[in-house]
Design a protein with these regions (language model features):
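N-terminal Rossmann-like NAD(P) cofactor-binding subdomain of oxidoreductases
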Residues: 2-205, 237, 315-316, 320-323, ...
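Charged docking surfaces used in two-component/phosphorelay signaling
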Residues: 187-361
Length: 361
C-alpha cells in the first residue's frame, strides 16, 4: 500500500459515486479503499451491487470491482478503514445531515456532494478557485463538533458552475443584477436516456428546488466569515429559471448582467482569460490549467464540442455581447457531473489536503 490517503465513498452505487470512482482511478494522492451503501447493497462486491447499472463511458476500474460494500450506517466500522470520505448518499436531508456529522465525529473529514449542509453556518461550501478562504471556518466547526480532525466541507450545486465563476472573474466591475436561465442535463438527475426515455425530444420547465439554489448559493460563495460563521453576500441579486433538457451531460446557462462599473467587452474577455485561483497556483492534480475559456465563434459553447474542456473541470463561455436591457449577456457551459459534482468535490479534497486539513489518520 502506498502513502496515498485512504478514501471511502458513501452512497456507493449511484451515478455521482460512479463518477467519483472513475475520477479517482490512478489518482496520485488518493486511493479508494472503502465503499459504503445502503444495507441492501452491503456484503456484495461493488460489481455485484452495481449490477448492470454502470453508467460511465469508461469501464468500471478493476481496483474497485471486488471491494465488498459496507453498510453506510455502521459509521465507526467504515470510518476505521479510511483517512477521509466523500459523501454522495441518497437519503432525506435530515438523515444526511446526521450521518455526515456522525462521520465527522469519528475524526473523519467528510467532503460532501450533498446539499444537506450547504447552509449550515460553520460548514464551508467551496469552489476552490472562488472561495478557498472559507475553509478557515472549519476551526469553529470543529469546536462545535468537539473534534480535532473531523469536519464537513461541501461543494455547491451543479447549476451555478456555468456562471458563478464567470461573475467572480468580473468582480472588479461590480455586477449587481443577474438574470439566468439554465438548461440542465439529465445526468443531473442521475439518469441516462435509457432510464428516462420520456426526456427524448422533450424539455421540462421545472427542477425541484433548483431555482432557489441557483439564486442563493453564489451569494454564500461570495460571503465572509464573521464570528465563526459564513455570512452570505447581498449582491449581485440573481433571478433564475432552471429547465431540464434532452442532453446527457453539460449544464448551459444564458445569463444577463448589470454592472456598477460598466466595462468594455475586451475587459470582460481579458478578465476571463486571466482568471486563476488557488488550485492553479498550487497545480493540484485535478485543477484545470485554464479554468475559464472564452470562445469567439458565434455557435459556441456547444455541449458536443466543449463539455469536456479541461477534462470536464473547466468552464466555457461565449456569445458575450452588449444587451438592450442589461449591460451584457453571455452563455456559459460546464460539466455537471465532473466540475459540478464529483470532480468539484475531488478538487475540494485536494485543496484541503494541500492546506493541511486532511492528513493520514
Amino acid at each position: 500500500m502506498s502513502e496515498k490517503l485512504r478514501v471511502g465513498i458513501l452512497g456507493a452505487t449511484g451515478m455521482v459515486v460512479q463518477r467519483f470512482i472513475s475520477l479517482l482511478e490512478n489518482h496520485p494522492w488518493f486511493e479508494v479503499v472503502t465503499l459504503a451503501a445502503s444495507p441492501r447493497s452491503a456484503g456484495k462486491t461493488y460489481e455485484e451491487a452495481v449490477g448492470g447499472r454502470w453508467k460511465m463511458d469508461t469501464p468500471m476500474p478493476e481496483a474497485v470491482k471486488n471491494i465488498v460494500v459496507m453498510n453506510v450506517n455502521e459509521v465507526e466500522k467504515v470510518a476505521s478503514t479510511v483517512d477521509f470520505v466523500f459523501s454522495a448518499v441518497d437519503m432525506s436531508k435530515d438523515e444526511i445531515k446526521a450521518i455526515e456529522e456522525e462521520y465527522a465525529k469519528t475524526e473523519t473529514p467528510v467532503v460532501s456532494n450533498n446539499s444537506a449542509h450547504r447552509w449550515t453556518p460553520d460548514v464551508p461550501m467551496v469552489v476552490p478557485e472562488i472561495n478557498p478562504e472559507h475553509f478557515d471556518v472549519i476551526q469553529y466547526q470543529k469546536k462545535r463538533l468537539g473534534t480535532t480532525k473531523g469536519f464537513i466541507a461541501v461543494k455547491p450545486n451543479c447549476s451555478i458552475q456555468s456562471y458563478a465563476p464567470v461573475l467572480t472573474a468580473w468582480k472588479e466591475f461590480e455586477p449587481y443584477e443577474v438574470v439566468a436561465t439554465t438548461y440542465q442535463a439529465i445526468s443531473g438527475a442521475g439518469k441516462t436516456f435509457k432510464d428516462w426515455p420520456e426526456m427524448e425530444h422533450n424539455i421540462i420547465p421545472y427542477i425541484g428546488g433548483e431555482e432557489e439554489k441557483s439564486e442563493k448559493e453564489p451569494l454564500r460563495l461570495w460571503g465572509k466569515i464573521e464570528d465563526g460563521v459564513i455570512v452570505p453576500a447581498t449582491e449581485p441579486v440573481i433571478t433564475c429559471q432552471c429547465l431540464r433538457v434532452p442532453v446527457l451531460n453539460g449544464h448551459t446557462a444564458a445569463v444577463f448582467v448589470k454592472f456598477r462599473k460598466k466595462p468594455t467587452k475586451e475587459q470582460l474577455i481579458e478578465a476571463l482569460r486571466n482568471f486563476r485561483g488557488l488550485p492553479q497556483e498550487l497545480e493540484l492534480p485535478s485543477a484545470p490549467k485554464h479554468f475559464i475559456q472564452y470562445l469567439e465563434e458565434d455557435n459556441r459553447p456547444q455541449v458536443s464540442e466543449d463539455v469536456n474542456y479541461e477534462h470536464g473541470m473547466g468552464v466555457s463561455v461565449g456569445r458575450l455581447r452588449e444587451d438592450t436591457v442589461y449591460d451584457y449577456k453571455f452563455v456559459g457551459l460546464s460539466h455537471n457531473t465532473v466540475r459540478g459534482a464529483a470532480g468539484g468535490a475531488v478538487l475540494c479534497a485536494e485543496t484541503l489536503k494541500a492546506k493541511g486539513y486532511i492528513t493520514k489518520k
